[in-house]
Amino acid sequence: MKPFATHPDAIPADLQDVMDRLGSVAIEVATRIARGGIDEDLAGLCGTNTDGDGQKALDVIADDAFRAALEGSAVRFYASEEQEEAVTLNEAGTLALAIDPLDGSSNIDTNLSVGTIFAIWPAAATAETSFLRPGSDLIAGGYIIYGPQVCLMVSFGQGTQKYVLDPGSRSFVLVDRAVKVPPASTEFAINASNYRHWSKPIRAYIDDCVAGTEGPRGRNFNMRWLASLVAETHRILARGGVFLYPRDGRKGYEQGRLRYLYECAPIAFVITQAGGGATDGENPILGQTPARLHARTPFIFGSAEKVARITAYHDLPEQETSALFGNRGLFRS
């Protein structure tokens, strides 16, 4: 049985085969993750990728598997976070696919959720022109999360769908055709250990959340941080809230750490199609054009009102983001 045989009408016909191939590999990756430590050490370091990040064995296994599965498909160009350059899979192909084969691999040995993130554009004449374009040109984007359940969240530009893997039939079952980001939540996700490196608007926003009922927001907030983008995204789609990975003052973090092609564009696509918001703190993510395959960007996404509020902090005069929260124009009546 093909992975999406039970709901063929939910996937555009020209993407059905590619989605089946992605789904088949995801099922095998999920099985290997479940057996990790029995047959092989999936968490062992086996090298570094093009940006110098350590590669776990499962990073390489997943990348090889997805690339091999897409040979002979409609995918003309394949760009992976684990590879320096894009490769041509099919000269006659009509699609360009970017992928983070195993997001959150630093969590493998702790048994936290990891995932696969993918983005699909129409193929252009070259790999460069296919991928170095705005996220608004996407025709599909999504992620697979390998957790207590294996789920696929995907958008084809007409809302966001949720599929759950049925282990018995080894197929993905469509459980929600119109996922929506809850508009209200008291949760935010950020790595607070980097507070001293953040810009003033980001500090001001977090300060106001931490101030709780005694601050201008008048309510208590909870902080979350999993260091797994797919897990953070999945929680926000279920419960609302906001995720922040801003730029900061450290060397190499001037544009954040998340990659536009492989992480930010597809996640922003899923979130905005579900009624949420996604920016770099000031401008919409999907309106940006990356300068190179592995370009990074600050990334803030979640419930639309919360993302808009963070953007408003960036619009305040500097003296107000430096002032005590009670004096900020954002909260004046």
Curated annotation (Swiss-Prot):
Co-factor requirement:
Mg(2+)
Provide the Gene Ontology terms for cellular component.
Answer: cytosol
Q: Which PROSITE patterns match?
A: FBPASE (PS00124)
Coiled-coil region list: none
- UniProt KW keywords: Calvin cycle, Carbohydrate metabolism, Cytoplasm, Hydrolase, Magnesium, Metal-binding
User: Top-level EC class, please?
Assistant: hydrolase
Residue positions binding Mg(2+) 1: 81, 100, 102
The Enzyme Commission number assigned here is 3.1.3.11
- Which pathway is this protein assigned to? Carbohydrate biosynthesis; Calvin cycle
Q: Where does Mg(2+) 2 bind?
A: 100, 103, 263
Q: Any binding details for the cofactor? A: Binds 2 magnesium ions per subunit.
Provide the residue positions that the database annotates as binding substrate.
103-106, 191
| Subcellular location(s) of the protein | Cytoplasm
Instruction: Name the HAMAP family on file.
Output: FBPase_class1
**Family indicated by similarity:** Belongs to the FBPase class 1 family.
Protein name, per record:
Fructose-1,6-bisphosphatase class 1 1
Q: What gene does the UniProt entry assign to this protein? A: fbp1
